[in-house]
């Protein structure tokens, strides 16, 4: 039995054909060994991301709000902790100590926690999400209390969206006690449909959600978006923009394909080995992300 931390920040038919394989994509592509990323501390990478967002139809208000947050965060921490342009690193390497970075943020902003992956992604992607229903606020408040602390202090973070949209997308989903990923995928899809959640499908911008299975008891299980970011595919690359955590940096990453993005996220967030919970899985909008796979030998890749 275990409980994960929640700060880590129509595929049903498809999965039916792959049920025996647990929906994983079979590929001989080597496991990701190196990432190319920027902390958006320079004008060139900011201009690149701004154009990608504009080309995808993200509003000027959402883009400006995002970069205002980036500037506030980057100005609060030691520049030596951030990249200069794009840099290469192992997927698990950091240029900073998370605790020192947290102290630097707190020194400048006191008790305001800042913005995390969910607030950042919803702020950027909000125009591509439609909500007509509601979520169970009791479960949401239990797990999203720090998110709500930020939204209470800075409601403009959602760029005019109602809190309801955030709740419906990120409130936990009750599920069954199983390690079967197709079952969990179908459960979250059905619950989102019940809540009236739908996505505007656009090839230039996609919401990428890292779904975690939490088991509090044999009869109390839930699915939670533990991390989320915005994918911006182009003809020659797959870009991914994220806020790593409340007091950790923004990142723009560049991958060759979705499988590399899957590896990056699974190396960071799939810690279900030897547990009673299902492996982490990754959704692209409301479906399983093409290229997602479970990594068999994570210790050799990170």
Each model region followed by its residue ranges:
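An anionic, turn-rich surface loop/hairpin at beta-sheet edges
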Residues: 253
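N-terminal export leaders
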Residues: 3-7
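Acidic/His-rich structured neighborhood in mature extracellular/periplasmic domains
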Residues: 48-215, 222-226, 233-248
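C-terminal motif of bacterial Sec signal peptides marking the signal peptidase cleavage site
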Residues: 19-22
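Bacterial signal peptide processing site
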Residues: 24-26
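N-terminal accessory/interface modules of nucleic-acid-binding and processing proteins
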Residues: 29-39, 43, 219
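Low-complexity, Gly/Ser/Thr/Pro-rich intrinsically disordered linker/tail segments
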Residues: 240-243, 247, 256-302
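N-terminal secretory signal peptides
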Residues: 1, 11-17
